[in-house]
Amino acid sequence: MFNIIKKTEYWEALDNKKVYSALRGGERALDGLKHIQDYWIMNQLIASKGLKICEIGGANSRIIPALNPNNECWNLDEFKGVGNGPTMADKIEDVKYVFANLGDFASDLPDNYFDVSFSISVIEHIPQSDMGNFWKDNHRIMKKGGKALHVIDIYIGNNPNLNLERKIDQYIYQPLEFGFSYNEEIQLKRPAVFTCDMASNSDWGMWRWNKISPLLVKSRSICQSVSIALILKK
């Protein structure tokens, strides 16, 4: 799949008592968009048992502690504070940590190993020049038949935007160049414009982000902060 997360998907995840309990309601993610993304990811993974799961750029993960303990969980992150992230790991018992980035081809990450990999709000921070290695490494670590789930922050306005269309094309087609395929048809309607069925960040959430990243104030003032969700298979 490749689409913008919809309100109905978010609400479905909130209505799932197991998901809501695992993420302790609204406690784990105070920000609106992160809350949407966490719940979408957790709704995909809540039934997972006995799987090898790697969070990419997990930092001090909100998802890994909420997963079934019968899974083998890994957290891949440099912990160098990139994107206002942490510089030290609050280590979780029985979770394996690899202090690297996807795209480094870290020897600690075995080939053809993971049933599931996922990232939350990571891909939009990666320079385009590094994306090829990101997808190549993501494909390397996955088992055949494994799934890669990624949620990506993006700003969408009322009118078509050529630069946005190019960025979306890169997100759609680059993984295919490295051996991935989509688990179902791409649903996103093009050109991409904001519609009221999309789950979106609150104005308060974007105001908070303005204090952290003021370079994007103009974009936030005229666009909605939403999330792409994609599911790839090897």
Predicted regions and their residues:
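Class I SAM-dependent methyltransferase Rossmann-like catalytic core
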Residues: 1-48
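A C-terminal cap/extension of S-adenosyl-L-methionine-dependent methyltransferases
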Residues: 93, 97, 189-234
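Class I SAM-dependent methyltransferase SAM/SAH-binding core
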Residues: 54-106
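A short SAM/SAH-binding and catalytic strip from SAM-dependent methyltransferases
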Residues: 115-129
